[in-house]
Curated annotation (Swiss-Prot):
HAMAP family in the record: Homoser_kinase
SUPFAM superfamilies: GHMP Kinase, C-terminal domain (SSF55060), Ribosomal protein S5 domain 2-like (SSF54211)
EC number(s) reported in the record: 2.7.1.39
Keywords: Amino-acid biosynthesis, ATP-binding, Cytoplasm, Kinase, Nucleotide-binding, Threonine biosynthesis, Transferase
Subcellular location: Cytoplasm
Free-text function comment from the UniProt entry: Catalyzes the ATP-dependent phosphorylation of L-homoserine to L-homoserine phosphate.
GO molecular function, one term: ATP binding
Organism of origin: Streptococcus pneumoniae serotype 4 (strain ATCC BAA-334 / TIGR4)
Origin superkingdom: Bacteria
Name under which the protein is recorded: Homoserine kinase
InterPro entries associated with the record: GHMP_kinase_C_dom, GHMP_kinase_C_sf, GHMP_kinase_N_dom, GHMP_knse_ATP-bd_CS, Homoserine_kinase, Ribosomal_Su5_D2-typ_SF, Ribsml_uS5_D2-typ_fold_subgr
Gene giving rise to this polypeptide: thrB
Entry annotated with the keyword Nucleotidyltransferase: no
Reaction(s) catalysed (UniProt annotation): L-homoserine + ATP = O-phospho-L-homoserine + ADP + H(+)
Length: 289
């Protein structure tokens, strides 16, 4: 069997730690024959373990410690430490591996509870499990999630050629906001979510770019962000935002305007790459060989 988990783009502006969307890049785990010891074959990076030290197996064995070892093949086009949920995809894959080999019959909500407990927040793991747009919360162990279709629009990801670790990106955030700032930030997030659910991308885009929770503190960590935002705004994008903790920059635009936006960005002296993406509507799934 093969376990497939989509990449995710979290926060979407003001939906900090609570809003995310699944997109069309994938982690794939092919489950092969039984062995005496676990073996993960991959070419993702020399520093990524091939045995039980791999995060995939740490998660699976944490849930079902006595799983029969197997040979696994891991492939992924989800870039590491780029703000597209690479670690979350592995967490969800590990849960699904335990679910399948341990015959647990977990519901999606049970998978979400496990994943959120491990990850600490649901914004990436929720869309990786459900697909589509997910608005979720985790408060004192209580996890809630609402799944919805993302409005019709094109996604364009600018993926830099450098990493930005989440812990480094979080280190620039303030320890607290004033009550007045929190109310303003919350109201913007409310409008962003409501507009997305209503299919109003113009209003959603304005609210996404109006975030007060994190982007203003993080934007200087991604040197291309300001120029990309300027170019995309001049060419009619709905919104441009930092995907997750960055450094990937996500552009949302109508289908007719995205080709011009992409062409203009290709003229810029950036060293990263542009990727056309779509919304993944399935989330984690298992295919028979």
């Amino acid at each position: 069997m093969k376990i497939i988990v989509p990449a995710t783009s979290a926060n979407i502006g003001p939906g900090f730690d609570s809003v995310g969307v699944a997109v069309t890049k994938y982690l794939q785990i092919e489950v092969c024959e039984e062995r005496d010891e676990w073996l993960i074959e991959h070419q993702i990076g020399k520093w990524i373990p091939h045995d039980e030290r791999n995060l995939l197996l740490k998660i699976a064995l944490q849930i079902v410690p006595d799983l029969q070892p197997r040979r696994l093949k891991m492939t992924s086009d989800v870039p590491l430490a780029r703000g597209l949920g690479s670690s979350s995809s592995v967490i969800v894959a590990g849960i699904e591996l335990a679910n399948q080999l341990g015959q647990l019959n977990l519901s999606d909500h049970e998978k979400l509870q496990l994943a959120t407990k491990i990850e600490g927040h649901p914004d990436n793991v929720a869309p990786a499990i459900y697909g589509n747009l997910v608005i979720a919360s985790s408060v004192e162990g209580q996890v809630s999630a609402i799944v919805a279709d993302f409005p019709e629009c094109d996604f364009l990801a600018y993926i830099p050629n450098y990493e930005l670790r989440t812990r480094d990106s979080r280190s620039v955030l303030p320890k607290k906001l004033s009550y007045k700032e929190a109310v303003a930030a919350s109201s913007i997030a409310n409008v962003a979510v409501a507009a997305l659910l209503a299919g109003d991308m113009v209003t959603a885009g304005q609210a996404i770019e109006g975030d007060l929770f994190h982007e203003r503190y993080r934007q200087d960590l991604v040197r291309e962000f300001a120029m990309i935002k300027q170019v995309t705004k001049e060419n009619g994008a709905y919104a441009t935002y930092l995907s997750g903790a960055g450094p990937t920059v996500m552009v949302l635009a109508s289908h007719d305007k995205m080709p011009t936006i992409k062409a203009e960005l290709e003229k810029q002296p950036f060293k990263g790459k542009l990727h056309d993406l779509r919304v993944d509507t399935q989330g984690v799934r298992v295919e028979a060989k």
